[in-house]
Amino acid sequence: RRQRQMCIRDSPIPPFTTSTLQQEASRKLGFSAYKTMRVAQKLYEGINLNKETSGLITYMRTDGVQISQEAITNIREFISNEYGKNFIPESPRYYKSKAANAQEAHEAIRPTNFTYSPKLISKYLDKDQLKLYDLIWKRTLSSQMASAELDKTTVDIKSKDNSITFRTNGSQIAFPGFLKVYKESFDEKTTSSDNDDDKLLPILNLNESLDLKKLEDEQHFTQPPARYTDASLVKKMEELGIGRPSTYASTLRVLVERDYVIKESGKLIPEERGRILTAFLSNFFGKYVDYEFTATLEKDLDKISDGKLPYKDLLSDFWRDFKKHLDKMTDLE
């Protein structure tokens, strides 16, 4: 028995910023943040296409989600020609960053020429370049496509003798829209839940006969928070206002290179050296490793960049307090 509960519209997400590119490349491609930026740098600087060097993507250090009007026009035209007019919304989509400290000085990361599809230029790219370019190309394309229409559905499956009923909740695609091209990945859930409404279900007919292939009995428990990955740590840094698009990858790289953390199966695990350093800084320099202090300092640096705050004032205020902490350290044995 299939029961349709409601039809919902699922809208596409914005094109990539530096942080979202690093997160999605980590989830979908298994790239570290550093590797993502290294490959993106090459795509930005230019690839030799038939004896002509062309930059394939826009600047890859950005917190902006907006793209130029010319690019939007070209993308909408491409979608209409490739998928049909019902796959483009009536009006172009415009996005604005939700990050508190976003400067949006640059466009989102997008292909510079949408006629250069991944398939068309695949022979000019190495394996990693093609994977990342394909990710950027599809994400940008999907950001200007029509919303997907999903039927929230409950399906009951009964045994032949009607003694057992299995129930599952999920969605069935009524109209794919942007899902025709791209679906976002997510970090692993930190808790178990019976709520599987996000699951995509196949189209089933009333009284359709199904074959049981496998039956598993599972017991779920509440799980502790998952360890950070490159993707989830970059996301957390952005939420806390720590760092900039230009520093996310290098920050994570330093943690590994200095043996503060190690990577196991993509998870970042603190090493003894990292734990000792954290304990020392928290005890003696707690103010300076506080998330709020770092976020506030980032905002002050923005004010200096905009000419709203003299840099000497910031340095003077910082050093006056910091020196007091340093002087206290000289008394430690």
Regions found by a protein language model. Name each.
Residues 3-8:
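Short, small-residue-biased leader/transition segments that mark boundaries at the very start
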